[in-house]
Every structure is written in structure tokens, then in C-alpha cells.
């Protein structure tokens, strides 16, 4: 009897579980009819809807083992239909209550339905976007829109874009035509699209292979001119960019790991930023994400493990809750990892008629541990106005490194002695950032207001112990601590003027930086400095589009006051006042697949606060490094032109830098000791060019980028007997293999010839990386396996030619590694937070 009861209970349980899942097939059935059938057949949920409202929306799909809400969501697809579930009641409605709807079907050259094609309805007066939609699995689309007539623009990757004047809402069947190109007998189909924009280039990510690469940082590594090395991002010819995600400035490269590639719509790489950006900014990357319809709770969890002779790992958990009006985000990240360096150093000193040669081998091993917390919330007042605030904290804990060195010193060719040394370093940092914003409209005027407060500390304790029978023993204790405060506000107003858009605004920053450096033994000078800086900026930028042309011009004025204090006493000789005007001009043209752009601007690079401090760091008895309070900012004048055609892009530019800041080594007065710091030099010039090719061959999707750079800097004028004005060639081949939407692989080969940058000459280098990405359950689970520097060829190798001294470094940083990243996504949505922050470039200087 007992067994019978258990069997009955098991059968009932199985039956109940089975009843919660459905499998059905629909072929050109209206959603109204499909919902009616579900309502009649299943009593688990009550489905509320208006039959006439949803009758125009038709569905063709196969549903397998889904719950009723999941089945309805699959039927809805990209239709402008909203579903809410409360307890056991489901409400399905179309929020756009229009009297007319544009309907049609998208098919390919074989009359097969084309899912996920983009349909945009444009105004017949000015081609402005009115409404849009996406075709479903059956190629069907329905777009509510009151305006008539309209221009329909239908686009899909690998097919020609269709423009169609629609006088009727019944658009019928639209047949797409493939875009085929012959390249040496091989058929090449559509690829990531490049388009020149005002001051830069826009790259489409949505519906391209880039959307399947994993994270935003993986996408950036594939873009023309953008380089990613150890999570450090640079733009060729421009240096480190400011990065914005939906108008919010990136605070850490970890944000790029958190952003999924398939959430990205477009990425704009701006190489000639307008007047609204700080005068120090030479490059900007703006990432725009797709609109996501999911609301409620969403979760993303990343678990990473890597091995490069030591284990390192991180865990990240991001929780978000979204409604139509409100969003709150909490993102916690923790990292732990060991690292190492195998250094071989050699430096020559030419002092007082003596030639001193020092050879040093110094292996280093260290550990880094860090934690970050990000909390943000915003509220959408209406479609045009929103407010929000965010808080971010980053800190390190239990970080250390230890180096073991052996030096061999020769003087005038004779052995002087040997030194055995250990160097223990304990660094520590902590950062807090608070941002608030309002973004909205009053009439036709757009408003973007941001306020930022930043607090940070950076500490370091060094212990050097040197033993030498010939030269004597030394013990050197060094302690340093920097504390920084930043207050900033930024206001941008935009308004339509004479057919274009005018932006004007102001940015205010106030910075306090306090630094202390102590050397107990007095081998180098101790110091206590305070730097106070105020920057008041005003700017105006105007942009105008005329047919195929776009024009932009702007000017930014900055009034900067810097006060410098040493042990509390103001040092008038290194205090500075700057009053500068920075103009910019851009001209762009676009027609069909062709686009072209020309830009000119003036920028200024200000030294970071550490470079301005009056401190010396003890490296060994022959090498010190540190700051320079007399360092002046450098002015940068740039002109650049570029063009794109489909999957081909090219650019060439020229840069002239006045009062160039260069990292250089020179002899300290009356000593056989070198000091490495930044110094100003009269001018520095460079010419650069780049070309990128991204065709598509079925499964194989390569991207080839070739870069050319040549500096013009008279190093011989400063005592260097080498010609450093030689060209550098670099190349990167990104090989991508798309076996299916859920399985991809990549092989990256990159390298360069001998590189010249100021006084530094880098040796040729090449490296090979590989990766495999596999997703499951519609990207809910993603596994990424990577192998970096497979052949162990990536090394840090360079020679610095200085003033009375040279140094050569050959270092292996244990770049060869293998890693595994496991990602889980639940109801993943994009962030709505729109704050752009203020004083972003000033934070980078801190």
C-alpha cells in the first residue's frame, strides 16, 4: 500500500511538472489567436489581451518545452508588444496605441524568411527616424506609426539596404539582394561597417560578428587603430582615449569586461574630439548599447581563472533591478593573482671622464589583490528627462612584491665590485568616486548636467637592502603617500540653430593633491608637497549637416591656475597660470559605401600630479627616478584625414608637439648617478598612417591592420649619437572563425619592427594569441578559453638613450598564459545610467 501511494504521488508530481511546459508550432498565426488557444487549453495562467489590438501581429515559430510566459515571450519576439506577469495572470498589450500599422514580410533571394532584419520608418521631409522594428522568425514585421507616407529603410548584414517609399501601410513582400564582391575569385559578403563621422569613425557592432566576441574589451581589440594590451587601451597616433558607455565615462577597464558584446549597437572612435572635451583629450571612444526590453531582476556572474606560472582569478557579481521608470545596479568585483618579471638591465654612465657599466639581473615576484564596488541608481521622469547618482569604490589589500638583484659594476673596463640586493615593495591604494547627473530637455534645448567628487590615496613602502664587499652595504627605507581630492561640475546645453546643432557649456574643476616622501637614511631628499589647481573652461561647438556633408567647428577656453607648496611654503617659481584657446574644425562627406573626413585641432597635455612632485625614488645606488616641479604642459597640433569603403578604412595624420614632455635619463650634478624623469624639449613631430581591411569569407572573418609611424626629433642635439628618426611598421591579423552562432574561435598575430619614441628604441616583437568561445542556452551560459603569447615571444625590450647615460632592458613579464572564463546571465539588461561625469581628464592626471 505504501509503495502504491508513493507511486501515485510521483505520477501526480510528474504530471504537474509536465503541465507547466508546452510544445507547439505556429505558422503565420495571429498572436491573438495563439493567445486564445493557450487560454482555452491551459488553466495555469489567465491571459488577458484585446483580440483586435494584437490581430495584426502574426507569428511563425516552434516552441519546445517552454513555460507559458516563456512561450508568449518567444511569440512576441521583437514586436512592440509588452507582457507583464503577476501571480497567475498574464497581460499582453501593444503600448503604442496607433490607428495604423505598417506590415510586411522580409525574404531573401531564395524567398526564405529573413529574421532579425532592421526596418526603419523615416520622414519623407527630412529623413528623420520616426519608428522602427525587427522582423520575426517568419520574416514578418508590424510597426505602429501614425504618419503617412513614409520612407522604409530595410537593412540586414550581408544584403543591400533597401529604401522604399510607402504610401500604404500594406508593404507586402520585400525581397533582399545579397551584397557580393569578388576578391581574386573568392566571393566576399557583408562585414562590420565603417562610417566616417564628425571627428572620427563609427563601427557597427549589432548584427555583425563583433557582437559575438564576448565582452566590450574583446570588441575594442578588433577595431581599426585600437590596441588592447593587458587591458590598457590605446588609439594609434593618439594615445589613451576617454571611454564612454552610453554617455557614462568608464572608470575602470573592468567595466568593458562587464559589458556584453551582443549588447553593443555601435562604437565610435573619435580621433578629433570637439570643444566639449577637455583640451588634454586626443581620442574618445563612445560605446552605444542596444535598447533592451527586459525588466525586473537581472544577474550576471563571471568566474575567471588563469595560469601564467602562477594562478590568478577574479569573481564578479552584478545585480540589476529595472522597471519602466527606475533602475538600481550593484556590481561587486574581487581579484587575486600573482605576477612576476625576469629583468635583465644594463646601463652605462659617462661622467667625469669615467665610463661606468652596470649589469643587473633582477627577478621579481609579487601578488595583487583588489576589490571594487559600484552602486548606481537613476529615475526616468519621462522619455526626455532622467536623474541619477552613482558611487564607486576601488581598493587594494595585501599587495606586495619582492625582487632579488645581483649587480656587476665595471669602471673604465675594470671590475669595480658586485652588489647583492633585495627590494621589498608594499603598495596600497583606495579610491572613492561620487557622481550625480540630470539629463533632459526643456522645449528644444537639451541639458546635460554632471557633478563629481573624487577622493583617492596611494601609498608605497620600499625597503632596499644592498650588500657588497667592495662597495659597502646599504639599507634604504622609502615611504610615500599621496592624497587627492577633486571637485568638478560640467554643464552642456544644445539647441538647434540654422539647421544644425549648437552645443555650449562650461566645466569647472578644483583639485588638491598632497604628497609626502620620506627617506630615513637621506640617500635621496625627503619632501612634502601640496599642489592646488583650478580649471575654469567654457566652450561652444557647432555641427551642421548638408546633404552628404557634415561640418563641425568649435572653440574651448581654459583658465588654469596651479599653486605649488613645499613644506607648506608657496614656491612662486613653479606656480603657473595658463590662459589658452583650443580651436577645432572637422569636415566629413558620406555617400553610399564611401565616406571621408578631415579634422584639425589644437590640444594640450598637462603633466600628471606625480610627475610634478619634488620627490626621488631610490632604485639602486646608480639610478634614481622621480618628479619635476618645473615641468610645463605640451601643446599638440594635429591634422588628420581618413576614408572608408565598406570593410576598408585608412587614415593619415601629422602631429607637431611644442614643449614636448619626454621621459629621459640624465646625470645628476657632480655625481656618478642617473636621474630619470620627464623634461620639456622644444618640439617633437610625427607622421602616421594606418589601413584596415575586414572582408568576410563564409566561416572565416579576418581583419588585417597595418600601421606606419615616424618621429622627427633631433636627439643628437642633446648628446645622443644615434639617428632615432626612423620609421616603425606594425601589423595585426585578427583571424576569426564563426562555426555557428554559439561557437567561435580566434587567432591573433601581431608584431612590429624596431620602434622609436622620443629617446627610447624598442626592439622588434611578435606574439600569437588564441581563443575559443562557446555559449549555451541562448547565451545564458558562456565559456571562453584563451591562450596568450603561445610561443613566449612577447618581451619588454628597449634601449633608452639619455643625456650622459644609456639604459637597456630585456624583461619577460610572464605573458604566456591560459585562462578560462565562465559567465552566467539571467535576464541580462543594459544599464540605463546616463551620467557622463565631470572632470574626467583631471581624474586621469591624479
Residue ranges and their predicted role:
Residues 90-95, 169-177, 185, 216-219, ...:
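N-terminal periplasmic accessory domains that precede
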Amino acid at each position: 500500500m505504501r509503495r502504491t501511494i508513493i507511486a501515485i504521488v510521483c505520477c501526480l508530481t510528474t504530471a504537474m511538472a509536465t503541465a507547466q511546459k508546452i510544445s507547439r508550432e505556429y505558422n503565420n498565426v495571429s498572436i491573438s489567436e495563439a493567445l486564445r488557444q493557450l487560454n482555452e487549453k491551459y488553466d495555469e495562467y489567465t491571459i488577458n489581451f484585446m483580440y483586435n489590438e494584437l490581430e495584426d501581429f502574426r507569428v511563425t515559430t516552434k516552441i519546445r518545452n517552454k513555460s507559458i510566459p516563456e512561450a508568449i515571450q518567444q511569440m512576441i519576439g521583437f514586436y512592440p508588444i509588452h507582457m507583464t506577469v503577476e501571480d497567475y495572470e498574464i497581460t499582453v498589450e501593444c503600448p503604442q496605441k496607433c490607428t495604423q500599422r505598417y506590415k510586411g514580410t522580409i525574404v531573401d533571394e531564395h524567398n526564405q524568411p529573413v529574421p532579425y532584419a532592421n526596418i526603419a520608418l523615416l520622414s519623407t521631409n527630412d529623413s528623420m527616424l520616426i519608428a522602427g522594428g525587427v522582423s520575426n522568425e517568419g520574416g514578418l514585421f508590424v510597426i505602429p506609426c501614425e504618419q503617412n507616407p513614409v520612407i522604409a529603410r530595410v537593412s540586414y548584414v550581408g544584403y543591400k539596404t533597401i529604401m522604399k517609399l510607402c504610401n500604404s501601410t500594406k508593404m507586402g513582400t520585400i525581397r533582399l539582394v545579397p551584397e557580393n564582391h569578388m576578391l581574386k575569385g573568392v566571393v566576399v559578403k557583408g562585414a562590420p561597417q565603417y562610417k566616417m563621422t564628425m571627428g572620427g569613425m563609427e563601427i557597427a557592432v549589432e548584427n555583425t560578428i563583433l557582437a559575438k566576441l564576448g565582452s566590450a574589451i574583446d570588441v575594442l581589440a578588433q577595431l581599426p587603430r585600437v590596441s588592447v594590451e593587458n587591458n590598457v587601451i590605446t588609439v594609434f597616433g593618439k594615445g589613451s582615449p576617454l571611454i564612454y558607455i552610453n554617455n557614462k565615462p568608464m572608470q575602470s577597464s573592468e567595466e568593458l569586461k562587464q559589458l556584453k558584446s551582443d549588447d553593443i549597437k555601435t562604437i565610435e572612435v573619435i580621433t578629433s574630439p570637439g570643444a566639449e572635451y577637455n583640451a588634454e583629450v586626443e581620442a574618445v571612444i563612445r560605446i552605444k548599447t542596444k535598447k533592451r526590453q527586459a525588466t525586473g531582476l537581472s544577474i550576471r556572474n563571471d568566474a575567471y581563472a588563469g595560469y601564467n606560472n602562477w594562478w590568478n582569478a577574479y569573481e564578479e557579481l552584478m545585480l540589476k533591478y529595472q522597471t519602466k521608470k527606475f533602475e538600481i545596479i550593484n556590481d561587486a568585483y574581487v581579484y587575486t593573482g600573482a605576477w612576476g618579471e625576469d629583468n635583465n638591465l644594463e646601463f652605462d654612465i659617462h661622467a667625469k671622464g669615467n665610463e661606468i657599466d652596470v649589469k643587473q639581473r633582477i627577478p621579481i615576484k609579487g601578488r595583487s589583490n583588489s576589490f571594487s564596488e559600484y552602486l548606481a541608481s537613476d529615475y526616468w521622469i519621462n522619455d526626455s528627462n532622467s536623474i541619477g547618482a552613482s558611487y564607486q569604490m576601488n581598493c587594494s589589500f595585501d599587495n606586495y612584491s619582492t625582487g632579488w638583484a645581483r649587480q656587476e659594476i665595471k669602471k673604465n673596463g675594470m671590475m669595480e665590485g658586485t652588489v647583492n640586493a633585495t627590494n621589498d615593495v608594499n603598495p596600497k591604494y583606495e579610491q572613492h568616486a561620487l557622481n550625480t547627473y540630470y539629463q533632459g530637455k526643456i522645449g528644444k534645448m537639451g541639458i546635460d548636467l554632471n557633478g563629481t567628487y573624487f577622493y583617492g590615496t596611494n601609498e608605497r613602502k620600499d625597503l632596499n637592502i644592498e650588500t657588497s664587499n667592495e662597495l659597502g652595504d646599504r639599507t634604504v627605507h622609502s615611504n610615500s603617500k599621496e592624497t587627492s581630492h577633486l571637485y568638478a561640475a560640467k554643464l552642456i546645453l544644445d539647441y538647434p540653430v540654422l539647421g544644425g546643432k549648437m552645443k555650449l557649456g562650461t566645466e569647472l574643476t578644483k583639485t588638491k593633491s598632497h604628497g609626502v616622501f620620506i627617506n630615513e637614511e637621506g640617500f635621496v631628499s625627503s619632501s612634502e608637497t601640496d599642489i592646488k589647481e583650478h580649471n575654469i573652461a567654457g566652450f561652444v561647438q557647432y555641427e551642421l549637416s548638408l546633404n552628404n556633408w557634415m561640418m563641425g567647428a568649435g572653440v574651448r577656453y581654459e583658465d588654469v591656475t596651479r599653486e605649488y607648496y613645499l613644506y607648506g611654503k608657496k614656491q612662486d617659481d613653479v606656480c603657473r597660470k595658463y590662459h589658452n584657446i583650443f580651436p577645432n574644425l572637422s569636415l566629413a562627406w558620406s555617400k553610399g559605401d564611401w565616406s571621408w573626413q578631415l579634422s584639425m585641432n589644437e590640444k594640450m597635455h598637462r603633466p600628471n600630479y606625480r610627475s610634478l612632485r619634488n620627490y626621488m625614488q631610490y632604485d639602486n645606488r646608480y639610478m634614481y627616478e622621480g618628479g619635476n616641479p618645473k615641468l610645463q604642459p605640451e601643446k599638440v597640433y594635429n591634422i588628420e584625414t581618413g576614408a572608408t569603403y565598406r570593410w576598408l578604412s585608412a587614415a593619415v595624420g601629422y602631429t607637431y608637439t611644442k614643449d614636448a614632455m619626454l621621459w629621459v635619463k640624465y646625470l645628476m650634478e657632480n655625481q656618478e648617478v642617473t636621474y630619470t624623469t620627464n623634461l620639456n624639449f622644444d618640439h617633437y613631430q610625427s607622421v602616421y598612417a594606418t589601413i584596415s581591411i575586414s572582408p568576410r569569407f563564409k566561416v572565416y572573418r579576418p581583419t588585417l591592420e597595418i600601421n606606419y609611424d615616424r618621429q622627427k626629433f633631433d636627439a643628437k642635439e642633446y648628446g645622443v649619437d644615434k639617428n632615432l628618426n626612423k620609421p616603425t611598421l606594425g601589423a595585426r591579423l585578427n583571424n576569426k572563425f564563426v562555426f555557428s552562432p554559439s561557437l567561435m574561435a580566434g587567432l591573433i598575430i601581431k608584431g612590429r619592427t624596431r620602434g622609436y619614441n622620443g629617446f627610447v628604441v624598442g626592439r622588434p616583437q611578435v606574439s600569437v594569441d588564441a581563443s575559443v568561445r562557446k555559449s549555451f542556452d541562448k547565451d545564458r551560459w558562456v565559456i571562453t578559453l584563451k591562450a596568450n603569447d603561445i610561443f613566449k615571444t612577447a618581451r619588454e625590450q628597449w634601449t633608452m638613450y639619455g643625456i650622459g647615460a644609456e639604459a637597456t632592458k630585456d624583461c619577460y613579464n610572464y605573458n604566456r598564459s591560459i585562462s578560462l572564463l565562465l559567465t552566467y546571465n539571467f535576464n541580462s539588461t543594459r544599464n540605463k545610467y546616463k551620467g557622463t561625469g565631470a572632470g574626467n581628464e583631471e581624474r586621469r592626471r591624479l
